[in-house]
Each structure stands twice: as structure tokens, then as C-alpha cells.
């Protein structure tokens, strides 16, 4: 392991010990915000420090085994050689673990998300495909134990959705779905096609982490136009007789959000404001990402919605993720919600890129 990484690990170990002392300090205990902040940092450092302690113990064991190799007794030398072989393998494993633990964590990984799917080119077929994508994500969410609540939806004339926005709630939602932002293309014979010709349609998917109260953007109420309307059957589970659905327009940016999922106007307004916050923050982050893209090109793509990230070819039963040149002939399984074979390689590709950067420091 590089000396710079060892020094970094020593610094983190010192910080871990320092926080341990602070958490028992009465001044810190009485300051709830500081105590919570330090407790979170302590929990994040703990697995790194514990792994580094194992690494240090293993290093000492290697030194002892190397000393034993100098013994005159051939049996002792043989034992030392066998032990050294095992310890060297363990050292490599611990080094890999430490490098992974040192990779910076995405602060949004544990957040819930807003999933937005819009039908693009392809007319009715694109709307039908948007419906297929929504069902794919809903089934994937079900396998993960997540909940999916539709916030707003506009149905297509022949089924599916022109646009659908849903809130996905659960553990580690963003960490798994963040790779889904972008343009998804489908190649198949539409139900409405009488000549049996293959058509190409597209949808855009946007994954927006739900804004934490700490991260919220300040919005001037004077810059909002709020309209109420009667909820339609498509948008939520409950069809209302009152004007409980909410549409909010952010005048400076033109961003429009709707919510008609809840029974009460108050709850719909709160959910719509949360979605607006997430959209504005996502736009701000996208702007920052574009500025950083010139300095650092990501292997998994920027997540820009104009970027074609995946093709679903039904005649060939093929799914291709263009960012990492991944091709799977498991279309039926993927479209039924088995997304792990697609998402797993994307996560590993990102980790490999981050590890390469870490090793090159």
C-alpha cells in the first residue's frame, strides 16, 4: 500500500480517537446538533479504523513470520513459510477492503428519490414504453423492499404514460437507482404496427434525490404560482370530488410540479414543494457536474438526460448499456424488474474508477 494512503489512515485513526473523547464531553453532549454530527462522523470512520487495525496486526504477524524464517530448525522455517503465505494473502484482501472504504461516499446514497419518466420520440409507443419502464422499476423496488408512491401521472392514449413521477422510499434507494438517469431506447414491433416493422422509441428517466431539510434551497413564496385542480384517476390511488390536487410553478425557472396522490390539499402541497426542491437542487447539481466534467470524465456517464444510456432490443432479447459496453441477453428478466445484473456492473465500474483515482493520488 502506498505510503500516502497509510498516512491518511493514520490521520483518520487519530480523528476517530479524538471524536471518541469528544462524545463523552458534557459540553458536546449538551449540544445536540454537534453531538449528532460527531456521532455520524464517528460511525463513518469506525469500519475504516477497525479494518486498518486488522491490517496493522497482520503486518506485525508478517514481521514475526519473517523472523521465524531465520530459525535453524527446518520445521519452524516450514511453519513460518506456510504462515507467511496465508498472511500475505490476508494483507492483499485487507488492502483491497481499505481502498474501498477510503473511496468517498456519495452523500445522497441513502436518500429516497423522485423517479421521473417522460415519453420521448415515438408517440404512442414511447408512452407504452414509459409504462413498461415504470413497471420495471416498481417491480425492482418490490424486490428491494422499497415503497413506490405515484406523485403525478399523465396517461398515454393507448396505455402507458406520457409522464409519470413517483417517490421511491427505502434503504439505499439512490445508491442503486442513480445510474438510471438518461435516455432509454426501445426497439420492437409496436402493438399498433400491422406490417410487423420494428420501431425505435425513447423515454427519458431522471432520478432526483429527495431533498433533506439541511440541503433545501430557499424559495421565495412570491416567485411561486400555485394552482388547485381536481385529481384525476390516473394520478393517484384516490379520486377526489374536491380540488385537492396541486400544481406549483416556479416562475424564475419555469419548473412545474404537480401532486395529486394525497387526499388533502395540504399534504399535496407539501409533497409538491418537496418535489420542487428536489428538481431545483438536481438542476443546480447538474450545472456543477457539467462544470466538473471538463476536469474529470466519469466512466458511467454524467447522467445527462440527453445521453442515450441503454437500449432494450425485443426481437433479439437484448439489453445493452452503452456507458460500459455491457450486453445481456436477459431482456425478459430485466423488464420484469431484475435490474441487479445491469446495476451491479455499473456500481463496480464506478468503484474501479474511484479506486484508480485513489491509487494515483
From Swiss-Prot:
- Provide the transmembrane region boundaries: none
Keyword Transferase set for record? no
Top-level taxon: Bacteria
Q: Which Pfam families match?
A: PCRF, RF-1
- What UniProt keywords apply to this chain's record, in alphabetical order? Cytoplasm, Methylation, Protein biosynthesis
Q: Where is this region: Disordered?
A: 286-306
Q: How is it modified after translation?
A: Methylated by PrmC. Methylation increases the termination efficiency of RF1.
Gene Ontology CC, one term: cytoplasm
Q: Which Gene3D superfamilies match?
A: 3.30.160.20, 3.30.70.1660, 6.10.140.1950
The main place the protein resides is cytoplasm
Which NCBIfam families does the record match to this protein?
A: prfA, PRK00591.1
Q: Which HAMAP family match?
A: Rel_fac_1
The entry's protein name is Peptide chain release factor 1
